[in-house]
Amino acid sequence: KLLKFEGVPLMRTGESLREMSDQEIFKILSEQEPDFSAKICDALKIEDLDKDAINLLKQKYAEKQNNKSFLTLPDEQILSDLELLKDGKLNYAALILLGKKESIKKYLPQCNIVIEYRLNHSMIPYTARVEYQEPLFIGIDKVWSYINQPASNPLLHISEGPYIYDVPSFNEEVIREAILNAVAHRSYQIQSDIVIKQYPDEITISNAGGFPIGVDINNILTVNSIPRSKRLTEILQKTGLVERSGQGVDKMFYYCIMESKPLPDYSKTDAYQVNLTFQAAIQDKAFLFFMKEVQESRAEKLNVFDLLTLDKIRKGINDSLDPNIIEKLRKEQLITVNEGTTYSLADKYKQFIPRKESIKGVTSQQLQKVNECFKTHDSISKSTLMETFNGVLTEKQVRNLISRMEQSGIIKRIGVGKATKYIKDWDKFKKYI
């Protein structure tokens, strides 16, 4: 119950009281919601449920629980055993998981997943858009199939020596878990869809309602959340569609680190919606190869907290690391301890870092400076480089530098005489820096 003075909700801060913000009021009221999915949907009948969805539920439950006899039970018995049917009445969990399209549209229209695809982030109109208002046991496969089209979820081909991997832009385990979490944790009191915005390099999933009680960005990996739709979540867990409470987020972080992609980003989440973003780009191929070799050689795999620590060390972060994990990784020779309590990844990681090619008579520092020039100019001239290397190289040395870069193919000459300019061949240039 909100504490009010003259109709204004107040919150205690230290010794004093202050007026609560709309966001704080909304969060407190949201926390008082009962389990929506266990609530009876009075008008819903068994005939309103999708037979194919019920069969899928049976199959997945029997497989997950190793109970083949479950397949032979009558539908009503199954619905009752899973607490989707009580005293002849079906609840909203039954509607969300098993309801026919027309039933969902009629009784819970906000139970809808929208996917918008855009070719780039500056586009306001979408390139393609589709909606799925389906029983979840059927809809989740359709949603993933749409996201996973070859043109919108291409494989990233990476290789280093004998190692060759095809990594999807967006990992199936990660995206399915994120979508199912959005369905299970969303607030159904808010009349808005789950919206998935997909780009070639990024995918964002947003759902109504902020984080569940007690969860925030800082503790999302360490707190077991209480889902808003507990009955619904229990069935998703029993049928193997989602991980046990708290482990789904672990899975998303785990796969992102294993594929050396940026961590799941919840930074745009507020009290009214959860906003989760995944990036497609691989940050460090050497780290990906390193992690695959380490995990494949182990009987007991490193957990998500071990991986997070290795990822932080890769990024040069040495603060707030768990000393127990550090000691474990040190003993297993996955990290080395440097002077001043800093850490670095083991030499095995460094073996996967490709050696840069070199140009005789040209230093890497000179190439870095030339590269900086190209960041601000599409093409450069000899005079541009004379300014860049003023006081460092003579005119003759600059001419020699240009000649060697041109011979190696990393720059190309355009124009003649005083109008001569040089453009960069990035595919060749990047091998040297």
Q: Which residue ranges define each predicted feature?
A:
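Conserved N-terminal catalytic/coupling substructures associated with nucleotide/phosphate chemistry
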Residues: 1-172, 176-291, 299-341, 400, ...
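Short alpha-helical segments that sit at the start of domains
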Residues: 281-306, 346-373
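Short capping segments at the starts of secondary-structure elements
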Residues: 312-318, 374-381
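Short, cationic-aromatic polyanion-contact patches
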Residues: 339-364, 416-433
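DNA-recognition alpha helix
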Residues: 384-390
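Short coil turns linking two alpha-helices in DNA-binding domains
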Residues: 394-397
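C-terminal regulatory/interaction regions
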Residues: 406-407, 422
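C-terminal interaction modules of eukaryotic adaptor/scaffold proteins
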Residues: 410-413
